[in-house]
Curated annotation (Swiss-Prot):
Keywords: Activator, Coiled coil, Nucleus, Transcription, Transcription regulation. Component of the Mediator complex. Belongs to the Mediator complex subunit 28 family. It comes from the Eukaryota. One of its GO terms (molecular function) is transcription coregulator activity. Signal peptide: none annotated. The lineage of its organism: Eukaryota, Metazoa, Ecdysozoa, Arthropoda, Hexapoda. Component of the Mediator complex, a coactivator involved in the regulated transcription of nearly all RNA polymerase II-dependent genes. Mediator functions as a bridge to convey information from gene-specific regulatory proteins to the basal RNA polymerase II transcription machinery. Mediator is recruited to promoters by direct interactions with regulatory proteins and serves as a scaffold for the assembly of a functional preinitiation complex with RNA polymerase II and the general transcription factors. It is found in: Nucleus. This is Mediator of RNA polymerase II transcription subunit 28.
């Protein structure tokens, strides 16, 4: 292995020593030792610079070794790249499969909604109910008095719909809301 100074050990040992001395200078808590703040900052700066220098030397060492491997054994580099690509392909295939599964769930939900709309008969209008000015059905006669602040025929939310909502559309809207609640985890799955 490459050595920086004779007798100082290998580069990995130097890196470990520089890291430990850097941590020691950062975590040292000796307010009563007679050293002032400037001396501590100088020591931290010195040990940090030493750590960065040794890290750069290690990076250069490994880059040299990588270059040697790529020139002497180019098939190893290609093998590594193939392995990385196969891992990336597997990850993307899993992601695609997840999206396909979600798509199938949504298709099934849409199919259920469409079948429910076509198979569901429209409810007959009760002779005791009249259609109000907003298209909402209201009981004939006295019925329930309107709440204060709301006009008769307005839904409880206070906003008048533009027109009457067909029962099939209402059913589809409810089914979509139920599916959204299931997807958010607020309702148990079917």
């Amino acid at each position: 292995m490459a050595q920086n100074d004779p007798g100082s050990g290998n580069l990995m040992d130097e890196f470990e020593e520089a890291f430990q001395s850097c941590l020691l200078s950062l975590t040292k808590q000796e307010p009563n030792s007679g050293t002032n703040k400037e001396e501590i900052e100088l020591e931290v700066q010195k040990t940090t610079n030493r750590f960065i220098d040794v890290a750069r030397q290690m990076e250069a060492f490994f880059l040299q070794k990588r270059f040697l491997v790529s020139t002497l054994k180019p098939y190893m580099l290609i093998k590594d790249e193939n392995q990385d690509l196969s891992i990336e392909i597997q990850r993307k295939e899993a992601l695609l499969q997840k999206h396909y599964n979600r798509l199938e769930e949504w298709k099934a939900c849409l199919s259920d909604i469409q079948q429910g709309v076509h198979n569901r008969p429209t409810p007959p209008i009760n002779p005791g109910m009249l259609q109000g000015p907003s298209g909402m059905q209201q009981p004939m006669g006295g019925g329930v008095p309107p709440r204060p602040g709301l006009m008769p025929g307005m839904p409880p939310g206070g906003m008048s719909p533009v027109g009457p909502m067909p029962p099939g559309q209402q059913h589809m809207l409810q089914a979509q809301q139920m599916q959204q609640l299931r997807m958010m985890g607020k309702l148990p799955p079917k």
